[in-house]
Amino acid sequence: VSFSYRDAGVDIDAGNWAVDLIKEKVRSTFGPEVLTGIGGFGSLFAFGGYREPVLVASADGVGTKLKIAIALDRHDTIGIDLVNHCVNDILTTGAAPLFFLDYVAMGKLRPEKVAAVVGGLAEACRANGCALVGGETAEMPGIYSGDDYDLAGFIVGAVERDRVVDGSRVQVGDLIWGLPSSGLHTNGYSLVRKLLEGEPLDRFWPELGRTLGEELLEPHRCYLEPVRRLLAPRVPASAGAGPESGGASADAAAGSGLRAQDPGPTTRGSALGTHGSMVDVRGMAHITGGGIPGNVSRIIPAGKKALFRWGSWPVQPIFKAIQELGRVPREEMLRVFNLGLGFVLICPPGDREKVKSLVPEALPVGEIVAAEGDERVEVTGG
């Protein structure tokens, strides 16, 4: 009796088929900066447009939101979640994305599922001017069972050394601005699934205006474009413009499925801050796991505290439904979910009018005050 790799649960032919299905999607994210094709051992990327670039790297996943995608057998948006999450993470330093890599692992490789996932990755990479330069698709029988799979992403961006944003310049009196989230984004799904266990995902919820499944799969919003308008200029406004730069057009961005993302051209690999107006952004936080307190505290210097005013921003119905269903205390909700704020910026009060002019959706949600103890974040009112 002879055995093959397929007998052990690994289908090389299925893997090759998956690669064939995703080739064009991946290639569609390439610009002239990508020096290698698909299938090499490593990806070569040449970038310019910076005086003194600092590379910024991050890795992340999408958590158990995957279980919702699996339950609905819809895999075309989970890649959008992953890319946008990673872009937002490096954006907090002022970095623009350069390139992205992904890792997909499943118990039994299904080429069509891989193609749907990578299609979402490529769509978001195009919208954000980021090249999808490589990845790994692993078939791992015995590690993942049934339809389960996992997804992780790795991003590299760049920022000028003298334009790094790290929170160190945050001062008492600075204003805190919030940008609305598109919903749960990619955090808190284990609690949500526990509370909604047995609830049909295809049931229409009047308070949501759509089915529960549609609400839970709403893509993680990307904040690159609104933040780009606020950051101080890095390069002249005319530099790198035009379709030859590899950037996504406004039509492509608007039709990308990232409905909360502002339309507008994105130049791959270009330094942020091409807008003519300047706002002194002193700190930025992406509100993910840990909520507002856990993430904003990471950028507040000692002796200062971020004071948020509860009620100064809208909280989407999905969060209210979760809190009521599980009788979850507000303190726990704040620790787990973004509660309507997906991204936070800290700017001096003198820039108030410029912030409102450049990003009308930005909401003043608090201010920086002096702190007596170790607490870096406080939410008052409500």
Model-predicted segments: where are they?
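N-terminal amphipathic/basic leader segments beginning at the initiator methionine
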Residues: 1-35
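Gly-rich Lys/Arg/Thr-decorated short loops/hinges at beta-loop-alpha junctions or inter-strand turns
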Residues: 2, 61-70, 204-211, 300
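Glycine-/charge-enriched secondary-structure boundary and capping motifs
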Residues: 2-9, 24, 113-131, 144-151, ...
